[in-house]
Amino acid sequence: MKFDMHCHTKEGSLDGKVEIEEYIRILKEKGYQGMLVSDHNSYNGYRYWRDHIKGKKYTDFVVLKGIEYDTNNAGHFLVILPEGVKPRILEMRGMPVELLTRVVHAYGGILGPAHPFGEKYLSFGSSKKYQRNPKIMQEFDFLEAYNSCEVEERNQEAKKAARKYFLAEFGGSDSHKADCIGTAYTEFREPIHTESDLIEQVK
């Protein structure tokens, strides 16, 4: 199954320009079977899909609930929790990465750095946490090894780190506007219909 694993919606991200229904339409046209909604410190994009679209349209397309969390010491992280888990703390930005990791794993979820070697103040690879102890990468479950918004050199650096620390590799567009949607993907060998399915495959 082909998923875009980094998507920002108008309903959930202040800088998102595309409504989630339009997102789904574009991805379906491009041959995708699913997406991870990963708005900034918010589940509102996913909530809109759940409350207004789910079960009524696009029933052959999988929408997974995620979040791009802004830590106070290690950049941005993609987080996926099992369905039904609702920790409000993830919509309050600013936890240190150590606490975020403990919280996510305590709830049975997974996390990994978004654009890990990208823009300086948003990326784990630029943080003092990583520079002082690169092996901290082993505490995560995956790494965004390809991000459409980053230059090839940065993506290659991410792929190298993922393979060094034996982390699952995600590809995502990190799209905020229509022309970026579907410019990256992650291929899953087994069917994914829920967040728990995804977590099981990554672990």
Regions found by a protein language model. Give the residues of each.
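Charged catalytic cores and adjacent phosphate/nucleic-acid-binding surfaces used
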Residues: 1-26, 32, 44-53, 57-58, ...
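Substrate-recognition element of Asp-dependent hydrolases with the DxDx(T/V) motif
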Residues: 37, 108-119
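Conserved beta-strand positions
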Residues: 37-40, 113, 145-148
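Glycine-rich, histidine-containing beta strand-loop boundary motifs that form or position
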Residues: 39, 67, 115, 173
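Two-metal-ion RNase H-like nuclease active-site motif
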Residues: 62-68
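Caspase-like (clan CD) cysteine peptidase catalytic core
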Residues: 92-94
